Amino acid sequence: MAALSSAAVTIPSMAPSAPGRRRMRSSLVVRASLGKAAGAAAVAVAASAMLAGGAMAQEVLLGANGGVLVFEPNDFTVKSGETITFKNNAGFPHNVVFDEDAVPSGVDVSKISQEEYLNAPGETFSVTLTVPGTYGFYCEPHAGAGMVGKVTVN
């Protein structure tokens, strides 16, 4: 017989609160029907890892809503190990090529670039950058139109 179990995970904030201001607390409550109480602990551990770990992601649109040939955003910062997902926002073919002259020393751009075109709206390419520094990238068919970007990895 399945029992209703729940688990709560609280992620403490390290930022001090301003005098007279109430401090907000981040939390996640997971409820699920689980056969064993140990299942609730597993859910709590997974939720904690998702909130505290590299589950954060940066989404970058390939092409703006108005049809402009840009990366949106085109200049952003991520933490080392954070996933960046590039999403085709229009019907134009786009790709994401990291410029070998604009990445940290030792980074192999062939391993992080998506040279194949994303042709349909909604198609995605994801990459995880781990070496801190600045990475320049561009859309091969639209670089001349200004479709270039920069990501800083901390």
From Swiss-Prot:
Its cofactor is Cu(2+). Residues 58-154 form the Plastocyanin-like domain. Cu cation binds at residues 94, 139, 142, 147. Residues 1-57 form a transit peptide. It is a peripheral membrane protein. It holds the Pfam family Copper-bind. It comes from the Eukaryota. It is found in: Plastid, Chloroplast thylakoid membrane. GO terms for molecular function: copper ion binding; electron transporter, transferring electrons from cytochrome b6/f complex of photosystem II activity. Coiled coil: none annotated. One of its GO terms (cellular component) is chloroplast thylakoid lumen. Keywords: Chloroplast, Copper, Electron transport, Membrane, Metal-binding, Plastid, Thylakoid, Transit peptide, Transport. NCBIfam families: cyanin_plasto. Belongs to the plastocyanin family. Participates in electron transfer between P700 and the cytochrome b6-f complex in photosystem I. This is Plastocyanin, chloroplastic. It comes from Oryza sativa subsp. indica (Rice).
